[in-house]
UniProtKB/Swiss-Prot annotation:
Domain GH16 intervals: 58-353
Subunit structure of this chain's protein: Homodimer.
Species of provenance: Zobellia galactanivorans (strain DSM 12802 / CCUG 47099 / CIP 106680 / NCIMB 13871 / Dsij)
InterPro entries: Beta_agarase, ConA-like_dom_sf, GH16
Known EC number: 3.2.1.81
Family: Belongs to the glycosyl hydrolase 16 family.
Keyword Signal: yes
Name of protein: Beta-agarase B
Functional summary from the UniProt entry: Cleaves the beta-1,4-linkages between beta-D-galactose and alpha-L-3,6-anhydro-galactose residues in agarose. Cleaves agarose in a random manner with retention of the anomeric-bond configuration, producing beta-anomers that give rise progressively to alpha-anomers when mutarotation takes place. Also tolerant to hybrid substrates containing C6-sulfate groups at the -4, +1, and +3 positions.
Length: 353
């Protein structure tokens, strides 16, 4: 149980989007800047009366799912959800944790960039999943945590995590990935630090953004498509490392994704031209745009929660130190800043009423 703030908003802007093993590979994946739509007030209404805040104690299972389940449908809670109300020490997670999770990535890969995922860098205590980052002794590598669900999910499904982004230049992530690493949905990807010692400059450009996107891949030769419009980097003025927030996605079908933050729809991507414009999901001759056998995001996916250093940030293509966003030893010495917390993750399927 925890306190959430439900807002009745009478005038709101609906933000609709056009849409390394994974994640970013170069600075070209940064957002195209565009002016954010602003909320407009109803004429004649004072700002104070445009919304009212209601404070209510709600169990995590009973918080309304913000997505529409569809005509004559309702949301059904799935038992693979986890509120982490148990103890799972870093070096011996125990049966309750291991029933739902493996404390590593979904294959033997140890992570991108300077990342080195370790089983003992995640634990459950005080009602939270926690992951922390430390320098690997005698190395530039960074030891970090990663867990993978033992049950896969597939559309139609709503997935939402309540998490607190690290106050770090490292990535805090909640995402989905198919077993063959060809389809990916990013629910949360954020870099929470306000300042980067390695770059020697302000980092608030990133600390105020959440990356919400998807990828389709061809693995050999490696090719990666993801939307690069500004809508894939959500921003509303919030600095995401300050408190817990809810990050969710409704994976309605292979061609439709809806992203929600704190229960508000912030991005929709829908249709073949935004999900897979390069025909990477063709069942025959992937990448050949002369034929169309695209499947879209149709594969079962693992749920992955992790922290990571990413190649495009620690080894930028420019080679410039001013573009190098990886934590220094001094920054890593602050364990609190480099700890990612997840209060819960919940999964729902639409079923007939």
């Amino acid at each position: 149980m925890y306190l959430i703030y439900l807002r009745l908003v009478f005038c709101c802007a609906l933000l609709l989007g056009c849409g390394d093993n994974s994640k970013f590979d170069s600075a070209t994946d940064l957002p195209v800047e565009q002016e954010q739509e602003q909320e407009t007030e109803q004429e004649g209404e004072p700002e104070e009366s445009s919304e009212q805040d209601l404070v209510e104690e709600v169990d995590w299972k009973d918080i309304p799912v913000p997505a529409d389940a569809g005509p004559n449908m309702k949301w059904e809670f799935q038992e693979i959800s986890d509120n982490f109300e148990y103890e799972a020490p870093a070096d011996n997670k125990g049966s309750e944790f291991l029933e739902k999770w493996d404390d590593f990535y979904h294959n033997a890969w140890a992570g991108p960039g300077l990342t080195e995922w370790k089983r003992d860098r995640s634990y459950v205590a005080d009602g939270e999943l926690k992951m922390w980052a430390t320098r690997k002794p005698g190395s530039d590598k960074i030891n970090m945590g990663c867990i993978t669900s033992k049950t896969r999910v597939v559309y139609p499904v709503y997935i939402e995590a309540r998490a607190k982004v690290m106050n770090s230049t490292l990535a805090s992530d909640v995402w989905l990935l198919s077993a063959d690493d060809t389809q990916e949905i990013d629910i949360l990807e954020a870099y929470g630090a306000d300042y980067s010692e390695s770059a020697g400059k302000d980092h608030s450009y990133f600390s105020k953004k959440v990356h919400i996107s998807h990828h389709v891949f061809i693995r050999d030769p490696f090719q990666d498509y993801q939307p690069k419009d500004a809508g894939s980097w959500f921003e509303d003025g919030t600095v995401w490392n300050k408190e817990f927030h809810r990050f969710g996605v409704y994976w309605r079908d292979p061609w439709h994704l809806e992203y929600y933050i704190d229960g508000v729809l912030v991005r929709t991507v829908s249709g073949k031209d935004i999900i897979d414009p390069k025909h990477f999901t063709n069942t025959t001759d992937p990448g050949n745009t002369e034929i169309d056998t695209r499947t879209g995001l149709n594969k079962e996916m693992d749920i992955i929660i992790n922290t990571e250093d990413q190649t495009w940030r620690s080894s930028p293509a420019s080679g410039l130190q001013s573009n190098t966003y990886t934590p220094t030893d001094n920054e890593l010495s602050n364990i609190e800043n480099n700890t990612f917390g997840v209060d819960w993750i919940r999964i729902y399927k639409p079923v007939e009423k």
